[in-house]
């Protein structure tokens, strides 16, 4: 399995590049080999930045992930902590995480505390600098005249020490958060493999995906800001203490305002918590509904049910959006309160100080303002930390609850050497779900299948055959008794599980290649000829869920996997239903009775003609074994077994002979080879595999745009929420920055003017300008305006962001429903779901904050540089080279950042693809004991993703440190030029300039990082936009060309030179199909695998559009109608019955168009009224995801009921009875004959008895019509393809099929045709069953 999963197509190109040894692939990280200075300055990353500038970054260019960051190492650490935690009454996964990784985080907090302490040096130096200038102007200074230069050096040095501490602290924090994220993803994956059935039924895949994407991501986000949150309160307290030292009691006025805001913050935080809990729940429901649609998209398109299912998802989304509006408003209140606090506090503090002192001291005032500015960061982070802390707490609780769900108990392994290999069940009573009283199960089962035996399990629909299989595998909960297995198990499920890999890898399934055994397996599983027809042979990639194979091919691959595993015990759940009768015969005799003859084989089967060959037969009814024994013992009992034979319409005397058996083996093989040569005499005409590419890949590599995020992506986001609303909010962003800057400038102007007034008074001159009281009033007015503008900006902007989020989801979802079918064939579901989870969550919760923060910081930086340059003009001299260096640093960094962001996103999708695949095949994974191999695959993909993320974070630190250096240089030069110009510059302007210059250190770096972060977040919009644009199906409705309401009236169909290919550039799969089907005709369609049977259905429903030619219904070209108008007037019963979670009523009538009477009448027609009445709620009873609370046979009957309710004029049966037993098959066929007698019916069949009463049979070969006539007429051609197919079913059955064809010709009711009697005895054969006991 490990080999299979690691060789995905999206990784193949990267492996090629790895061979070229570009970059650091396969090497240790340069960080691990760096010296102290290189590590301190992140200089070890210089070479990597240059590499990213020169090359398009690939995953293979990255160095190996450090061993201490690998998920395997982290898993061991968390496992110990979690073991301790689960012993507690209220375990917490977050506590376990802190216990495992907390020590490292303490180091991060220590480093950040040093940085915080150093921040307070700046305001202190600022005050001293202002005093130095004032005293120099007055000539009263006792300090060294060069003291200003010393202050500049102290400011620069301490700021750089703070920067070093900050970035190394952040590096540790992000690493800790990523470790927690990784380990949550891994532990959730491990748990998903082990979930019990009761836990699985209550947990949807969508919920689990949300845990792995959104909830795990919260850890990274929280720990990225953990230090800011942990030290916010100490930082605020120290600021206030230093503020008190500067200005005295007015500090308490500001403190009082902050204390008054606490209750409001608390209320908003509480509301945020409550709203977030509901939001997560609604998100789970939406993702679950979306995932279900994607899993069954083909059926939804065939039924034209897009509107019904879209309504469900949009309803979920609208409920989510309502809460998102509430969440946004509470968050905005929190942001407004905290962001406005420093401005409001400054107004109160300055006003109080002036009121008390009746004058303004520049050194005190501007030091105070610097302290108040330092408060902005911890206060600004508080709402974010509170919101993220709430989300982390909820996420941690959800993860904890999930990890505490009950697990599947391993089946007892018997190691008694005296016992033969096999399955042992003693007095076993089992159930699917202990918590539900009405849960189906098995009662008091005593069963043994041991040694070299073949045991067949039979029973009617819903009797418990598959339930027995699941009990043997340990998938059911044991209420009483014992179940044990001796030996290894191989399992073939009823619906084949195929992994997204090559055909060969699907068969080998992680085991070492034994070429001889492999070739033998291909032979006995009848796969050799199929492989020859694939252009890439067994290296063809068969796609997610095996979309590149027919149902029969998928099942044969599944059987081949089991056979190749060379297990001791084989448990096969109805594997022959999906294959043609002649292939089934080959599999039974060559495989089950051939290569597996030395094994224990348990075969659930609906093909009763094989019963004489079984060593034992078990008969099930209502979850109990009612009969057991050899075939001959059972037919003499005249009990349930005889009843089943009678319902199937098989004479027990006939089946006891050589019915459905091969002719002489050599002769049979010659016949098969001869017909295959005839069928494929023109090799070039054979249809290639669906969607095959020249390199054998099927799944498309995930798109990765190169270069910067395009402007159209930003424009997409801007216009999504309403361009006018965005424009208004941008105006408020400008006004907010302008009002705050102007407010601070006015304070400087006021202090300067106040000093000049004092000088005028002292000189006896008339003072000019505004009075101090007037200046105070203007200052207060400007401050209040800034607060008001901030409130308006936040409310408008965050309202806009929710509108944008709503519009983007709707557009994405609607575009997805309109995608052509080949898009879903090429695109793994996990990748699509990633758009609806991680990417959409980013748009819902992260992009708005990221853009807002970036715009605020960018405008502040611009305002700062302009203001400082006006006050200190000489600063423009060093500012020019500094700006150039800044530009180049940012330019180089963006190449690195973009490459890493995109690879991180691309390496994330395979994690979810693999998870989705695992959930679909979890029973097979457990049966084959492949859990650990899949966990290793998950770890490898996690490590690839983590490597990208941690490298990106290192690059952020690399840039941040260098930008801080530049910002500190600006402050340094500002001090230098102020010292030079100390005799002419205003002290108030010194305070203003240095105060703003000090803020550059943090703001410049944060602005640059936020620019990169915003681009990262916009990648979510970019990836969603990729799905919004691109190929779409034809319109659902064409207003100018709609069919009449009663169309089609007759149901005639005409194919006129129809040519169809799956995609442009591929060979056609239908080649010039021309025929007419009369109204009400019953047409059977047969042909070998790849002949084009299912392609005709795809063309009729326009799932694939015709390349040439046309199809007409009642004389109307179907290409001119909308898809909805076409598909709603057709009906199909597909091979794989699909039910959706909801109610039985919704599954039958999703648009609520039928009356209660119609529904119950239809239920009676399919003979399920007793079952429905026994369900709690009847028609409104719950249907679980995938309809797992119904058997496959019952699901197919419900699908038949859907078709009955449609009352179509044209019905298509696409191998509709392939997966049901004989009784259900007979019921379905009888219902179709009776209820659809006035319909045109096209039947694609594996069981020839279902089509021998057709009016005509169409035999397809290599995409062309080989034969098309009445069954009896075709059977007169001894060299015909239909004749061969009939003969291949075995002599006895061939005679019966000919009688059916003759009866149809003579107008005799086929129900009157009894199976042939024992007068006709075919010649002896090596495969003749043993005679009955005498």
From Swiss-Prot:
Main localisation: membrane
Keyword vocabulary terms for this entry: ATP-binding, Membrane, Nucleotide-binding, Repeat, Transmembrane, Transmembrane helix, Transport
PROSITE patterns: ABC_TM1F (PS50929), ABC_TRANSPORTER_1 (PS00211), ABC_TRANSPORTER_2 (PS50893)
Annotated ABC transporter domain residues: 423-647, 1053-1287
Pfam short name (any one): ABC_membrane
Entry's Gene Ontology cellular component terms: membrane
GO biological process terms on file: sorocarp development; transmembrane transport
Family per record: Belongs to the ABC transporter superfamily. ABCC family. Conjugate transporter (TC 3.A.1.208) subfamily.
Protein name per its UniProtKB record: ABC transporter C family member 10
Organism whose genome encodes this protein: Dictyostelium discoideum (Social amoeba)
């Amino acid at each position: 399995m490990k080999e299979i999963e690691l060789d995905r197509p999206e990784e193949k190109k990267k492996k090629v590049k790895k061979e070229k040894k570009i970059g650091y692939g396969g090497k240790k990280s340069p960080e691990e080999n760096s010296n102290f200075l290189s590590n301190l300055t992140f200089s070890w990353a210089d070479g990597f930045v240059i590499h990213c500038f020169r090359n398009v970054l690939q995953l293979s260019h990255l160095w190996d992930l450090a061993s201490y960051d690998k998920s395997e190492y982290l898993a061991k650490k968390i496992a110990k902590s979690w073991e301790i935690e689960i012993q507690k009454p209220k375990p917490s996964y977050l506590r376990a995480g802190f216990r495992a990784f907390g020590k490292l985080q303490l180091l991060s907090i220590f480093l950040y505390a040093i940085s915080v302490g150093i921040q307070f040096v700046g305001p202190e130096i600022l005050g001293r600098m202002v005093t130095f200038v004032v005293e120099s102007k007055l000539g009263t200074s006792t300090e060294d005249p060069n003291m200003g230069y010393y202050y500049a050096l102290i400011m620069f040095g301490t700021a750089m020490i703070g920067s070093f501490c900050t970035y190394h602290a952040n590096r540790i924090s992000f690493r800790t958060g990523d470790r927690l994220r990784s380990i949550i993803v891994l532990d959730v994956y491990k748990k998903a493999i082990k979930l019990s059935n009761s836990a699985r039924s209550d947990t949807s895949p969508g919920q689990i995906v949300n845990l792995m994407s959104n909830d795990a991501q919260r850890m990274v986000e929280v720990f990225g800001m953990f230090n800011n949150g942990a030290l916010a309160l100490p930082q605020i307290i120290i600021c206030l203490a230093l503020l008190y030292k500067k200005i005295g009691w007015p500090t308490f006025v500001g403190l009082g305002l902050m204390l008054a805001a606490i209750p409001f913050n608390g209320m908003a935080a509480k509301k945020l918590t409550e709203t977030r809990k509901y939001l997560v729940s609604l998100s789970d429901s939406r993702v679950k509904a979306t995932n279900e649609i994607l899993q069954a998209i083909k059926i939804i398109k065939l039924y034209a049910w897009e509107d019904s299912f879209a309504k469900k998802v949009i309803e979920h989304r609208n409920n989510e959006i309502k809460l998102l509006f509430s969440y946004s408003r509470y968050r905005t209140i929190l942001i407004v309160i905290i962001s406005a606090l420093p401005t409001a506090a400054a107004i109160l503090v300055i006003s109080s100080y002036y009121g008390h002192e009746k004058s303004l001291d520049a050194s005190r005032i501007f030091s105070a303002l610097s302290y108040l500015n330092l408060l902005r960061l911890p206060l600004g982070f508080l709402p974010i930390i509170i919101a993220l802390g709430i989300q982390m707490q909820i996420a941690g609780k959800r993860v904890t609850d999930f990890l505490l769900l009950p697990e599947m108990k391993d089946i007892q392994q018997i190691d008694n050497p005296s016992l033969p290999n096999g399955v042992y069940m003693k007095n076993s009573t089992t159930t699917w779900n202990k918590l539900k009283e009405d849960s189906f199960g098995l009662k008091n089962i005593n069963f043994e299948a041991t040694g070299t035996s073949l045991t067949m399990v039979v029973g009617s629909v819903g009797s418990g055959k598959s339930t027995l299989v699941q009990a043997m595998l340990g998938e059911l909960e044991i209420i009483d008794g014992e179940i044990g297995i001796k030996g290894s198990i191989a399992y073939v499920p009823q619906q084949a599980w195929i992994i997204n890999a090559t055909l060969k890898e699907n068969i080998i399934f992680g085991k070492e290649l034994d070429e001889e055994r492999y070739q033998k397996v291909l032979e006995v599983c009848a796969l050799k000829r199929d492989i020859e027809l694939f252009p890439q042979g067994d290296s063809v990639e068969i796609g997610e869920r095996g979309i590149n194979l027919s149902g029969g091919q998928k099942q044969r691959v599944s059987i081949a996997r089991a056979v190749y595993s060379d297990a001791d015990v084989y448990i096969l759940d109805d594997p022959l239903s999906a294959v043609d009768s002649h292939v089934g015969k080959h599999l039974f005799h060559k495989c089950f009775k051939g290569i597996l003859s030395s094994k224990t084989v348990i075969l659930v089967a609906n093909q009763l003609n094989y019963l004489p060959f079984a060593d034992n037969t078990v008969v099930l009814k209502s979850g109990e074994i009612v009969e057991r024994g050899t075939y001959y013992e059972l037919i003499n009992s005249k009990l349930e077994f005889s009843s089943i034979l009678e319902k199937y319409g098989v004479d027990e005397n006939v089946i006891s002979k050589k019915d459905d058996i091969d002719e002489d083996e050599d002769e049979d093989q010659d016949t098969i080879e001869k017909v295959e040569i005839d069928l494929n005499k023109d090799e070039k005409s054979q249809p290639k595999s669906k969607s095959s590419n020249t390199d054998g890949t099927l799944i498309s590599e995930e798109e990765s745009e190169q270069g910067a995020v395009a402007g159209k992506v930003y424009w997409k986001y801007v216009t999504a929420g309403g361009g006018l609303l965005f424009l208004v909010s941008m105006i408020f962003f400008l006004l907010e920055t302008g009002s705050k800057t102007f407010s601070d400038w006015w304070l400087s102007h006021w202090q300067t003017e106040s000093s000049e007034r004092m000088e005028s008074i002292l000189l006896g001159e008339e003072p000019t300008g505004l009075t101090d009281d007037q200046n105070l009033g203007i200052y207060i007015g400007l401050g209040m305006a800034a607060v008001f503008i901030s409130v308006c900006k936040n409310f408008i902007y965050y309202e806009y962001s929710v509108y944008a989020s709503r519009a983007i989801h709707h557009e994405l979802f609607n575009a997805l429903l309109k995608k052509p079918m080949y898009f879903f064939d090429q695109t793994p579901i996990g990748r699509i779901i990633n758009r609806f989870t991680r990417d959409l969550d980013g748009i819902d919760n992260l992009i708005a904050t990221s853009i807002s923060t970036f715009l605020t910081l960018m405008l502040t930086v611009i305002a700062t540089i302009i203001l400082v340059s006006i006050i200190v003009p000489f600063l423009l001299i060093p500012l020019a080279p500094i700006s150039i260096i800044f530009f180049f640093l940012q330019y180089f960094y963006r190449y690195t950042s973009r490459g890493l962001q995109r690879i991180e996103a691309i390496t994330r999708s395979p994690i979810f693809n693999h998870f989705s695949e695992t959930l679909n095949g979890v029973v097979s994974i457990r049966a084959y004991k492949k859990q650990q191999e899949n966990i290793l695959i998950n770890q490898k993909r996690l490590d690839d993703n983590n490597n990208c993320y941690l490298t990106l974070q290192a690059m952020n630190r690399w840039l941040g440190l260098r930008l801080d250096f530049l910002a500190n240089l600006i402050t340094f030069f500002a001090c230098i030029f102020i010292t030079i110009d100390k005799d002419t510059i205003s002290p108030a302007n010194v305070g203003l300039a240095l105060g703003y210059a000090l803020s550059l250190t943090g703001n410049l770096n944060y602005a640059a990082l936020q620019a990169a972060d915003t681009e990262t977040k916009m990648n979510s919009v970019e990836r969603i936009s990729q799905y919004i644009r691109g190929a779409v199906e034809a319109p659902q409705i064409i207003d100018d060309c709609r069919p009449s309401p009663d169309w089609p009236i007759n149901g005639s169909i005409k194919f006129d030179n129809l040519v169809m290919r799956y995609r442009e550039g591929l060979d056609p799969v239908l080649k010039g199909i021309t025929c007419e089907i009369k109204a009400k005709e019953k047409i059977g369609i047969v042909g070998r695998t790849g002949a084009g049977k299912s392609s005709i259905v795809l063309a009729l429903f326009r799932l694939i559009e015709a390349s040439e030619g046309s199809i007409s219904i009642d004389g109307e070209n179907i290409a001119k109608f909308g898809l909805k108008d076409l598909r709603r007037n057709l009906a199909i019963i597909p091979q794989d019955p699909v039910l959706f979670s909801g109610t039985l009523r919704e599954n039958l009538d999703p648009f609520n168009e039928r009356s209660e009477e119609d529904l119950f009448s239809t239920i009676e027609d399919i003979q399920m009224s007793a079952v429905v009445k026994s369900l709690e709620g009847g028609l409104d009873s719950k249907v679980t995801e995938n309809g797992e609370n119904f058997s496959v046979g019952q699901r197919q009957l419900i699908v038949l009921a859907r078709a009955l309710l449609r009352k179509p004029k044209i019905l298509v049966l696409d191998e509709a009875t392939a997966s049901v037993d004989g009784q259900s098959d007979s019921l379905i066929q009888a219902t179709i004959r009776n209820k659809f007698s006035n319909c045109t019916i096209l039947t694609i069949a594996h069981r020839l008895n279902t089509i021998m009463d057709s009016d005509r049979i169409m035999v397809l070969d290599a995409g062309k019509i080989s034969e098309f006539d009445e069954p009896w007429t075709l059977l007169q051609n001894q060299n015909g393809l239909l004749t061969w197919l009939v003969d291949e079913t075995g002599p006895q059955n061939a005679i019966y099929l000919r009688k059916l064809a003759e009866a149809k010709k003579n107008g005799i009711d086929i129900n009157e045709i009894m199976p042939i009697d024992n007068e006709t005895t075919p010649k002896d054969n090596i495969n003749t069953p043993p005679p009955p006991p005498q």
